[in-house]
């Protein structure tokens, strides 16, 4: 799951403060900051295309539509919309040609290019992707300027160590890992696609190598892989590199091109969203251990070495290994209490069967709109990291928001076989959920006595119906791995007493207390 603290460390943020009041004391008179603000304000002139100007020139993609960003990530093309070596090379090429046109010699062009890159790093707030690409470009320029004859791979390794010294937590930045690893393999095995082959084949090979290298990073961070991304890149790489990017830079200078750029952006987004609507190429893969990651990189390194020699048969072994990883399960028998903040969610797994009790859900306060299901950041990544694609039983202890609201999200993102409700009348939330279940043809039941799953029984302890939803909670008793579990939902003291009077369960090993322990 997403580790906010580790993310902040990777961005060189080591503490968080709350500002109670703010007062403008004076303007920053620094020349560089003034120029930076002027350049950013220039981008605001392009009203329609500003999000992409901001993303592809200044490295800030916070203005991009979240659904579009999700489609880019799902299609495996998000790297094209973060500043990378391609963007730096185009910018540097434009600047280099400009210096040549006004009569600067080779040596002066190199020095001014270094200053340009240093200022560009400052302009983009020293973002991780810009730092990596710019430091590498500066290393290549210095290598050429002083004729050091250092290989590009060694320049990249030197760049890596510089970034580690500046911020060791860069290793936790996914973009940095993508950038360094893919660049390393593309440079090290550049003979694979530097031969006399067609542009389409060269683009495919670059995408193929990039996909294989990025596979473990994708799996261990997103737990899903789109196997069509190699082919999607055949369209998006040339389109973004040779059409969209040049228009972004040109429109920044010539504002009247904004309408054309906006049309290209819409085309790009529509195609990405259309492709993202197809789910068949997306495979959920459970998290890879360090052992499997090491073995994987050894295998693909051997494969690339053989491809350099023109031998392609080893690719079949790589594909078989990836297929094995995709169907490998990391689902031990057990009970996991998932942290969903204010709410409940419990995962029970045995004999490859999956039972999810409650889904959590964010409580709404006042007019605050409910937008982001907590299950998206907690339950979904956790289940996917275990390779879970299907939930055999989704048990709703009762219809309170903090137990059942994200059930809508769960049934939208997982194959759910059956849903179990508690006794008593359905509340409004449960009625809405039932409408969704009917549309998806998902079976649902209520007020059941027990579930028998592969000779493991979950007993639903019934003591009659109550006047409040909390005491009508499904109370579940089960034995797993030699331990006795009791899940109380939001049941209060009255129902606890009734259960103890009716059932002999005083020797429970693990008790999930009712109503989060507050009643």
Model-based region annotation:
Residues 401-438:
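Active-site HxH/HxHxD metal-binding segment of metal-dependent hydrolases
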Residues 56, 84, 125, 175, ...:
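Divalent metal-coordination and catalytic microenvironments
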Residues 162-172, 276-393, 438-510, 515-518:
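Core dinuclear metal-dependent hydrolase active-site scaffold
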Residues 88, 127-131, 363-364, 399-404, ...:
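Active-site environment of divalent metal-dependent phosphoester hydrolases
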Residues 17, 68-230, 287-330, 423:
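Hydrophobic alpha-helical transmembrane segments in multi-pass membrane proteins
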Residues 1-79, 366-369, 374-384, 390, ...:
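Membrane-interface helix/helix-cap signal primarily in integral membrane proteins
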Residues 24, 29, 74, 219-235, ...:
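Membrane-interface amphipathic/re-entrant loop segments adjacent to transmembrane helices
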Residues 10-136, 141, 393, 458, ...:
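Aromatic-rich juxtamembrane segments at the membrane interface
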